[in-house]
Design a protein with these regions (language model features):
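Amphipathic oligomerization regions
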Residues: 157-178
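Gram-negative outer-membrane assembly/targeting C-terminal domains
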Residues: 177-197
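Short amphipathic alpha-helical signal-transduction/dimerization elements
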Residues: 47, 97, 172-179, 183
Length: 197
């Protein structure tokens, strides 16, 4: 946890308790529920080579005299995927931005990895609420040596509702500001994944 009020647990079933239809519905994002922070934490594990990190909100608390009272430190909870699987996922996520549905998150000259998301909202009485969606885009940059990860999630956007249409452009615009502020220069690859040919 992150020690904030209102923090929720996600819904992710134990494979031992699942049936074949559960696997099929989970493959398209149904039957799973995570908070934005939980989703970003999972994406960071892909970005960093497989380590699930303990998130923290406060980087450092410093007293007036300069004494460090508390400091957030990198804490690895466990390895959740191998480096090889993480690399394969990074490559696929980079193609989402360079070739797939996440092109609206692309910034010329930068290697960005990402994933679009469009989820139906649950109705109060069960089932799904007609015309109500959560649109998201999550990603990190640079795709080959990640430094920054971000999630943009819109609850019930009006008009267009796909993550690629509404969330990815916000991700791109925000990321451009971060890259500029941090002085991160474009890669020589002009934003395209390196070819293995």
């Amino acid at each position: 946890g992150i020690e904030l009020p209102g923090e929720e647990g996600g819904i992710l079933y134990n494979p031992k308790d699942m049936y074949e239809p559960d696997v099929a519905t989970m493959a398209i994002g149904q039957g799973v529920a995570v908070t934005p922070l939980q989703e970003l934490r999972a994406i960071c594990a892909i970005a960093n080579g497989g380590e699930l990190l303990q998130p923290y909100i406060i980087k450092k608390i410093v007293a007036a005299d300069g004494t460090v009272i508390k400091e957030g430190k990198k804490t690895v909870v466990r390895n959740v995927i191998t480096e090889q699987v993480a690399r394969q996922m990074r490559e696929m996520m980079e193609k989402v931005v360079s070739e797939g549905g996440g092109k609206t998150a692309a910034i010329k000259g930068y290697r960005i990895a990402g994933k679009t998301g469009t989820a139906e909202k649950l109705a109060a009485g069960g089932g799904y609420a007609a015309g109500q969606y959560i649109a998201s885009f999550v990603g990190f940059v640079p795709a080959d040596k990640p430094r920054y990860a971000m999630l943009v999630m819109l609850d019930t956007p009006q008009g267009a509702f796909y993550g690629s249409q509404v969330s990815a452009p916000i991700f791109r615009d925000t990321l451009q500001q971060i890259l500029f502020a941090k002085g991160i220069q474009p890669a020589a690859s002009e934003g395209l994944p390196l070819s293995r040919r």
